[in-house]
């Protein structure tokens, strides 16, 4: 099944509708991110599944998240890595939760624009968000946190 790219506004609308249908998800916007822990969780969960290029993306993410160098350190290949984390069924849900929380942290820091810009062609985040009601609860919560901050 081919995913159809949709606009950011349509994704917001879909998520709002599904939150209304399935009950509220409470979003903590108190700047209480545990971004280093989330990054460590992501690494621990996926490092053995990553090829050399993907491990390089993890090193770049370390510069972004842990060393606070900004998203400009992420290479173009980050989008492919993001797609693997969000869309590969054999990758664990914990990896998606950690990645979404890291993206939410980036959004809170006004540092997500570059990532969204890289995603303008493939719409990986928006296509993932379209399946909101079919996601595990922890993924729904993390995605709602990301969208809530972007809104």
Task: Give residue spans per PLM region.
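Fungal intrinsically disordered, low-complexity polar regions
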Residues: 3-4
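Alpha-helical solenoid scaffolds in large eukaryotic transport, assembly, and signaling factors
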Residues: 7-151
């Amino acid at each position: 099944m081919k995913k159809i790219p949709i606009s950011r506004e349509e994704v917001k609308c879909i998520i709002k509708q599904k939150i209304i249908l399935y009950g509220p998800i409470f979003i903590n916007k108190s700047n209480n991110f545990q971004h280093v822990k989330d990054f460590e969780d992501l690494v621990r969960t996926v490092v053995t599944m990553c090829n050399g290029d993907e491990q390089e993306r993890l090193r770049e993410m370390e510069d972004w998240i842990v060393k606070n160098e900004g998203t400009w350190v992420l290479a173009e290949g980050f989008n492919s890595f993001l797609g693997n984390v969000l869309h590969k069924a054999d990758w664990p849900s914990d990896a998606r939760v950690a990645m979404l929380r890291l993206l939410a942290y980036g959004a809170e820091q006004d540092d997500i624009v570059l990532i969204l810009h890289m995603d303008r062609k493939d719409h990986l985040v928006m296509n993932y968000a379209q399946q909101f009601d079919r996601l595990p609860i922890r993924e729904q919560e993390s995605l709602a946190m990301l969208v809530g901050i972007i809104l």
